UniProtKB/Swiss-Prot annotation:
The lineage of its organism: Archaea, Methanobacteriati, Methanobacteriota, Methanomada group, Methanobacteria. It comes from Methanothermobacter thermautotrophicus (strain ATCC 29096 / DSM 1053 / JCM 10044 / NBRC 100330 / Delta H) (Methanobacterium thermoautotrophicum). Keywords: Chromosome, Cytoplasm, DNA-binding. It is found in: Cytoplasm; Chromosome. CDD domains: HFD_archaea_histone-like. It comes from the Archaea. This is DNA-binding protein HMt-1.1. InterPro entries: Archaeal_histone_HMF, CBFA_NFYB_domain, Histone-fold, HmfB-like. Belongs to the archaeal histone HMF family.
């Protein structure tokens, strides 16, 4: 089961134009978002370390997201 709250995930799908959404669809998107978020986070940590920092900054996240 995904750790992200399901209600906001459902709103994301609704904002994309869906009228009805199954619980399985919400769970699947939540899982995909978590996996993508972890991948971006790992890359952002690498970028911060490469810059000689222990703190991950917003720019690290933005750069990591663009690279993936």
């Amino acid at each position: 089961m995904a750790e992200l709250p399901i209600a906001p995930v459902g709103r994301i799908i609704k904002n994309a134009g869906a009228q009805r959404i199954s619980d399985d669809a919400k769970e699947a998107l939540a899982k995909a978002l978590e996996e993508m978020g972890e991948e971006i986070s790992r890359k952002a940590v690498e970028l911060a370390k490469h810059a000689g920092r222990k703190t991950v900054k917003a720019t690290d996240i933005e750069m990591a997201a663009k690279q993936l």
